Amino acid sequence: MTDFGITGYGAYVPRLRIDRALIAEAHKWMAPGLKGQAKGSRAFTSWDEDAITMAVEAARDALTGADVNGLKAIYLASTTLPYADLQNSAIVAGAILAPTNISSSDVGNSQRAGTSGLLQALKAGEPSLFIASDAPVGKPASAQEVAYGAGAAAFTLGAENVIAKLVGMASVTDTFVDHFRATGEKYEYFWEERWVRDEGYAKLAPAAIKAALANANLGIESISHFVMPSLLRGAADAVAKVVKFTGAIAPGLENGVGYAGAAQAAL
């Protein structure tokens, strides 16, 4: 694993933007509280875009100057893949002219697919392409309609010209439900934000961070950058405070992109 890691990266964000103030204005008669969240704009997909097309664009960006024929596997993580019983990653593989003997895998069913899928690819230890692409849809007049965006990010993985490698990891699995979307449903059900923040992020995230640091044999003072995707503004800052992190916190991309679901961490 010491000689294997990320060798290249790419991204794609749809060109279209919607001003959040317009969303709040349209729903003010039934959800006046949205006005306080109506800052900036967010990305959204055009009529001919979806998780697959965005994945292809991000993959092509990541593969600039690279040999696609050297890939052994392709992974596609998303919660909004267009096909339920047809391998979406295989379509991406065809679009980027990958060799036909490549292994392809779809990773989904959770907005954590972006990180869990990347860990799977890193553990496999073979030349591969990992893509996270998502365009979650919020229920009309909900906070999610205001916050959700769209985008994709891709990483090439290999053992040559490594620019970032995995030095430690940890996972915490708990049946904590902050939101869910049942099979066949278009929109999600969300629990109250204070519950998610205080009982979820504030307790589970620090436990995972401390375990990852221990696995890497590092102290928090050795870390210079902290990336934590969250639909709740300020969640990353709150968790950083709990674990006594004083370095740079990656911006949440709220303005211009929005929260891109499974692709958020990679973006």
Predicted regions and their residues:
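Active-site-flanking structural segment that lines cofactor/substrate pockets
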Residues: 39, 46-64
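Buried hydrophobic positions in well-ordered alpha/beta secondary-structure cores of metabolic enzymes
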Residues: 6-8, 62, 74-75, 92, ...
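Short glycine-rich or small-residue beta-strand-to-loop segments that form or flank ligand, phosphate
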Residues: 72-80, 226-227
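Conserved catalytic cysteine-centered active-site region
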Residues: 32-36, 41-49, 79-129, 133, ...
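Structural signature of outer-membrane beta-barrel domains
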Residues: 11-13, 81, 233
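Condensing-enzyme catalytic core mediating Claisen C-C bond formation in acyl metabolism
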Residues: 1-48, 142-199, 203, 210
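Hydrophobic pocket-lining "lid/loop/helix" segments that shape and contact the acyl-thioester
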Residues: 3, 56, 60-63, 158-260, ...
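Short coil/turn connectors at secondary-structure junctions
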Residues: 1-3, 69-72, 99-102, 124-128, ...
